[in-house]
From Swiss-Prot:
EC number annotated for this UniProt entry: 6.1.1.17
Key words of the record: Aminoacyl-tRNA synthetase, ATP-binding, Cytoplasm, Ligase, Nucleotide-binding, Protein biosynthesis
Protein biosynthesis listed as a keyword: yes
Function description: Catalyzes the attachment of glutamate to tRNA(Glu) in a two-step reaction: glutamate is first activated by ATP to form Glu-AMP and then transferred to the acceptor end of tRNA(Glu).
UniProt protein name: Glutamate--tRNA ligase
EC class (word): ligase
Listed GO MF terms: ATP binding; glutamate-tRNA ligase activity
Gene Ontology cellular component annotations, sorted alphabetically: cytosol; protein-containing complex
HAMAP family given in the database record: Glu_tRNA_synth_type2 (MF_02076)
Organism whose genome encodes this protein: Korarchaeum cryptofilum (strain OPF8)
Catalytic activity: tRNA(Glu) + L-glutamate + ATP = L-glutamyl-tRNA(Glu) + AMP + diphosphate
Compartment(s) of residence: Cytoplasm
């Protein structure tokens, strides 16, 4: 038991450092998540945890940091089984996540965040958050903030779950503040004869690139290209009338390498700069330049961008910039649910989804609203690893991890969906029922029953007949007398045995709490189950996650009307 005591003290210290004071319930939940084999000894654990919590709450911060440092070291060793990075030197690795603020981040963005973050921390390096905001037509200020909020929650969870600290980015960069610098680099390419302004229609450009045929603009004098470039910058061209192209090789086997466009005119207000700029770099130019200029040593991206690696390396070399490692990882898809914002946005705009935080979709805020703990997402992607193989995710895999996190800490409540009234013959009110707050706790919650009738779920009567026996949780055994469409007649059983009797949840009729349970099914459908719960439902805080007995884990979404969202069973 000595190693368990040591673990309890470490977890209590970690909790105290994070929240200012250690909490017994939180520490118990964490240790049961890490050591599920200890569930059977929970009664012995509780006094040990209470003692540890009292002790660490009296310790100075320096002592707590010493204890927690050991915990993080152990967790960090666990993560080291990830493959080594090529050409990586400890203390000098710089990685980044580079989201475009054009929507709310999804589960797919979580992988793009966590893979480079984990590697940066494993190598005691630096991690950057860089907003790729050079397409103003689809970018909004609200998306910058959403990305900051959701990414912050995941990185904090990464520190808690994997011991990788600090659980935040080291520097934030906004690409659009570097546009003038990128204009100078573009001019440098033109002056070196490595780029030219093309005014061919977009369809003609696509056709010629496919066939490997250059256009007349390719051989324009440098002076002409500089003149046209200034005209682009000064508003002389409308959107689509001109773009700056990189001069490469029109016969290159990779079509992406055939004189790609690197700057274009976009006539849209930028969320930060308004109408100050109208010429913006394409992704290949901005990502290659910014990765080099900001010191990135290892740039991770989804392997869908692999055909663009040649272009990006060419840009870096043409400008004489510092080169870096480009590493691809596999994409993820979610079984039966679209991840792409181009699929989700129309569903939001049409009203099919109530917003980007709709619990039916795998946006990060949708998952959090559904009751998925950020630690579950971190653990899932850690187990998945940085593989280059594409993966199809079944949400049950994440639910399984989430269940292990919630089960030790979520209090149990009774909720009766689709209720039917049941009268109990032989029950003399008032009666005080005692129900478990949690299977691993001695605590009980009292429910006062002032009448001889309760609500039970209509589904619990399926297949039953008069004479069959049930047990109302924490109350009494009953025998079915009769079943009608709108009412059931029960009587108190002569024998009050527990074993071998089906135990069901119930709610008082007089003081039961009306509640709704939102059950996500697909991006296009859901079920809203109405019902009644025990009186204690009134005390649940908004955002709190509980377990409805025999129903599943649920998060309180709003208080008026009392509405829960089903996380999973």
């Amino acid at each position: 038991m000595e190693d368990v005591k040591e673990l309890i003290v470490r977890l209590a210290a970690e909790n105290a450092l994070k929240y200012g004071k250690a909490d017994t319930k939180a520490v118990i939940g964490k240790i049961l998540y890490m050591r599920p084999d200890l569930k059977q000894n929970v009664r012995e654990l509780i006094p040990l945890v209470e003692e540890a919590v009292r002790a660490v709450n009296e310790m100075p911060k320096e002592a707590l940091e010493g204890i927690v440092g050991e915990v993080k070291k152990e967790k960090k060793e666990e993560v080291r089984k990830w493959p080594d990075l090529p050409k990586a030197e400890r203390g000098k690795v710089v990685t980044r996540v580079a989201p475009e603020p054009n929507g709310y981040p999804t589960l797919g963005h979580a992988k793009g965040l966590l893979v480079p973050f984990i590697y940066a921390r494993l190598y005691d390096g630096k991690f950057l958050l860089r907003f790729e905001d050079t397409n103003p037509r689809v970018e909004r200020l609200e998306y910058y903030e959403a990305i900051r909020n959701e990414f912050s929650r995941l990185l904090e969870a990464c520190e808690e779950e994997l011991g990788l600290s600090p659980g935040r980015w080291d520097e934030e960069i906004i690409e659009s503040y570097h546009l003038e610098e990128m204009y100078s680099l573009a001019k440098k390419l033109i002056e070196a004869g490595k780029a030219y302004v093309c005014t061919c229609p977009a369809a003609e450009v696509r056709k010629r690139r496919k066939l490997g045929i250059s256009c007349d603009h390719r051989d324009q004098p440098i002076e002409k290209n500089l003149e046209l470039w200034e005209k682009m910058l000064n508003g002389g061209f409308r959107e689509g009338e001109a773009h700056l192209r990189l001069k490469t090789d029109m016969s290159h086997p990779n079509v992406t390498m055939r004189d790609p466009g690197i700057f274009r005119v976009i006539e849209a207000e930028h969320p930060i700069h308004g109408d100050k700029y109208r010429v913006y770099p394409v992704y290949d130019f901005s990502v290659s330049v910014m990765d080099s200029l900001t010191g990135v040593t290892h740039a991770f991206r989804s392997k869908e961008f692999e055909p663009h690696v040649d272009v990006q390396r060419h840009i870096v070399r043409a400008l004489g910039l510092r080169e870096y490692e480009m590493i691809q990882f596999g994409r993820i898809t979610v079984e039966g649910i679209p991840l792409s914002k181009r699929y989700i946005r129309p569903l939001v705009e049409s009203g099919i989804l109530e917003g980007w935080d709709d619990p039916r979709i795998p946006t990060l805020r949708g998952l959090f609203r559904r009751g998925i703990n950020p630690r579950a997402i971190v653990r899932f992607f850690y187990e998945l690893g940085p593989s280059k193989v594409d993966a199809t995710v079944n949400m049950e895999a994440i639910a399984s991890i989430n269940r292990k996190i919630l089960d030790p800490i979520a209090e149990r409540y009774m909720f009766v969906p689709n209720p039917i009234k049941a009268k109990i013959e032989g029950l003399t009110p008032p009666v005080i029922a005692q129900v478990e707050v949690h299977p691993d706790s001695k605590r009980k919650r009292e429910i006062r029953l002032d009448e001889s009738e309760v609500f039970i779920a209509s589904s619990d009567l399926e297949g039953l007949k008069p004479g069959d026996e049930l047990r109302l949780r924490g109350l009494v055994n009953v025998t079915i007398r009769s079943v009608n469409p709108d009412e059931v007649s029960l009587r108190v059983s002569e024998e009050q045995r527990v074993k071998g009797v089906k135990i069901i949840q119930w709610a008082p009729v007089r003081n039961g709490v009306p509640a709704r349970l939102f059950v996500p099914e697909s991006p296009y459908s859901f079920r809203m189950l109405g019902g009644y719960g025990e009186p204690a439902l009134r005390g649940i805080k908004e955002g709190e996650i509980v377990q409805f007995v025999r129903v599943g884990f649920a998060r309180l979404d709003r208080r008026d009307p009392l509405t829960f969202i089903l996380s999973h069973d």
